[in-house]
């Protein structure tokens, strides 16, 4: 048998780097995500 480990090890830096506002703005797809969230009326656009 194998043991299942907890895969989510939270770190604020990696969280911001992958899902933050600047990383969203840096790519075309990310800007699309922000646009979609604005249109939907999300209170928080990014993390």
Curated annotation (Swiss-Prot):
GO terms for biological process: translation. GO terms for molecular function: structural constituent of ribosome. The lineage of its organism: Bacteria, Bacillati, Bacillota, Clostridia, Eubacteriales. Keywords: Ribonucleoprotein, Ribosomal protein. This is Large ribosomal subunit protein bL34. Coiled coil: none annotated. It comes from the Bacteria. GO terms for cellular component: ribonucleoprotein complex; ribosome. Pfam families: Ribosomal_L34 (PF00468). Belongs to the bacterial ribosomal protein bL34 family. The gene is rpmH. It comes from Symbiobacterium thermophilum (strain DSM 24528 / JCM 14929 / IAM 14863 / T). Residues 29-47 have a biased composition (Basic residues). Residues 9-47 are annotated as: Disordered.
């Amino acid at each position: 048998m194998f043991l299942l480990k907890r895969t989510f090890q939270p770190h604020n830096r990696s969280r911001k780097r992958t899902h933050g506002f600047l990383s969203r703005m840096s790519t075309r797809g990310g800007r699309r995500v922000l646009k979609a969230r604005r249109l939907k009326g999300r209170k928080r656009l990014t993390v």
